[in-house]
């Protein structure tokens, strides 16, 4: 009898790769294969709660006071399996919440706390997140008690808030509304590095690639020891801090407040060499049950814990709010030292041992700082702010409270998504505030407006183009953009190159809106798109009514941070066959990125491209991809003609030309975005559905459904109602 493990799939040599999902994958053969699958992630098939679950309703029924009371009790309920430093879990819960939210970046709105992604790879195993798994596990009894009444995403942030409150800090408020996902966000680009803490993301003189907002793979922001090329240099570190925090929408004052406020509490952990630390969460053995980084150094916990390898405690009261961070920062001169793990840090010169250790029997130690802490003293701009906070602790507390709220709510979207009794009343400019609706047009008003729009002399393509330009700025990542607010008429959107072709149409619609006085311009723009589609369908011999839900409002310039909105400008919009410039990234990849931000599925992407090409809303007015003899009519001709084997395609510079195989006559021109629907096997399969003889009716109905979805992506007020 043999005990050798056998492969159940072959009966021959054991091989784990023979198992389900193993073996050579498509991506191994074709590493540049288009990731159409990313449009279908987070489907109902992965959601255990089902499509009928209403998180808003579930959270609103929670006993919020009881939940917070349970969290307060947890803060000092130290567990033997992972004891609390200084007898209080608050500092590690602040780190947990910060690192959940701190992955957000403005470039594409991805990352952040809004989806509970810290539970999944790669975030759950990042080097910067060592031992945060313990914090989430400490929370499990509370999450188990309240179940789906509060999401993990909300609980992580609320726990950080309660941690601050139990340590004597007054927070700015808290809003729930983050719904959990059940698998990793595989669409997020975290970098190309293949080893943790590598940094191949820079070019030239330290130009960080967009949309990244961290200096190394596996870090939230910056290396606390300083840049990899300048360890121990606070000024070099300050440059990294300024860039990474700016890419998370933080200015200098917010940056100083966040770093100092966070480092008022707790400590870092570097009691011994990293060689004692085991595998991360994803690589840990089965019996570890989702806990990583098991340590063989001493007890592996408490005073023996190892996380970053740095061993720094900033203040005399690490479990209580104070101004000691700034007092210590400026009181002492600082000299470099190595932590017990060998990491570079700083210790106060000639200081007394006034800093407590993490356990009651720990000896006191001298004040210590990170290189990035010293940046707040030695960078001239940061120093000015730091000294003001040193002299005015109340200003520091106010700045930290607001910056913490912004950090933890930046990707939650507009206030209409906020839930709970602690939502601040104040409107903040970064929330992209909207005025309250004062009038909702009646059905008669809408009918009158539709008639005026139809009689305006504007073509179907012009009407559809302006509505698309307004609505397609939406990003499902951070819930910004969209048609509500009609910000297409304000800076910076009115000045974007991609929007110049719709300027005349917009001006005409503004005239109609002012003359009517019965609807917002935001509603009129979307309604114009509906009219355009109905006209295009009529031109194709079909009578339809595009669903329209009024209630949008018009934002003012004072409610619009032009600089903040600049990141929403599309560098490419394949739906309009637009690219601002030539990129190393193929156009079809940029198209999928845009589609994913619009929360479109692959079928929705496909049908929208076909319909918008038939109507012809190309930003430059070209005929690329307009594979029809009746442009402006809502036909499925794009698919029929793209799939026609009588056409032979040839590259011609940046475009492609389609020739009749028999006559050699040039019939069409198209871009990579157009031709990918015949080239990519998945997209071609979808195109065949809409290009079939029985696909015309399906094409129109699915196009209208996808169109209405895009127009309503930012109508969070409807869900709230």
From Swiss-Prot:
Q: Which family does it belong to?
A: Belongs to the peroxidase family. Peroxidase/catalase subfamily.
Q: How does it assemble?
A: Homodimer or homotetramer.
InterPro entries per UniProt:
Catalase_peroxidase, Haem_peroxidase, Haem_peroxidase_sf, Peroxidases_AS, Peroxidases_heam-ligand_BS
Which Pfam families has this protein been placed in?
peroxidase
Taxonomy, superkingdom: Bacteria
Name this polypeptide is given:
Catalase-peroxidase
Q: What does this protein do?
A: Bifunctional enzyme with both catalase and broad-spectrum peroxidase activity.
